[in-house]
């Protein structure tokens, strides 16, 4: 599949989701690639109480809300493993 993005974020944990939200909100074409599960390790956490603006939630709920917010701004998501990166002129190619 060949598609052009302004940014490809490798890793769909909280940091990757935050980056996707901000970049997509700024109207960048964003793809998040995660090899296992969007949300990462925090999805198995039953109690999240230290996330800014959130009094208490669980990891699954937090990251599903983050994904929805990123998607609402236009970010795309793909479940697959990145096997390589290469530089070809002005372009970066993700395999």
Regions found by a protein language model. Name each.
Residues 2-15:
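Beta1/beta-strand and adjacent pyrophosphate-binding region of the FAD-binding site
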Residues 20, 24:
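Gly/Ala-rich phosphate-binding loop of Rossmann-like dinucleotide-binding domains
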